[in-house]
Amino acid sequence: MLLQLREAIGKQKMLIVSPECVTVYQGVPDYSADTPGQAYNYFVNVIRLADQAIDLYQPQAYNNWYDVPGGTVNYLKDVYLNWRNYKGIMDWMKPIENFEGVAGRKLMMGVLASTSAGGAAYYYQPSVLQEFISWLSENKYELNGFMIWDSHWDSLNGNAISNIATQ
């Protein structure tokens, strides 16, 4: 379906996938795309089949369960490493077999603009977001950018998140 959509819209338009509450997670089985009730890893097969058609992925770095607390730099690192299919921060994790991961140039991390924009436990203080950006730079990891949910809450929060994300 995504390949046909790409063909129909051509290369002049971008195809951006923003999976809500869907995650790539090395700690669970690799489900098929039609397995009902599975938010974890069913998207791996979508990526395998249609990555060449997709310009950007914007996974939420919130509202998804990982083995580290939300709102922390380790949560951001874990989301990033899992979507890239690099070894996660948990010692027992292993990359998903036969899966290249999402290229950093295609990955945008979805973050909350304030505690009011979603689950407060998943809000990243500007200092945490800055620490994550520094970690990316230190490790020479590529990231296309951030998707901030949403601009209304960011404005009410003094543009704290967009100011950090655009540095």
Model-predicted segments: where are they?
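Secreted glycan hydrolases and related glycan-binding modules that recognize and/or cleave
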Residues: M1-Q167
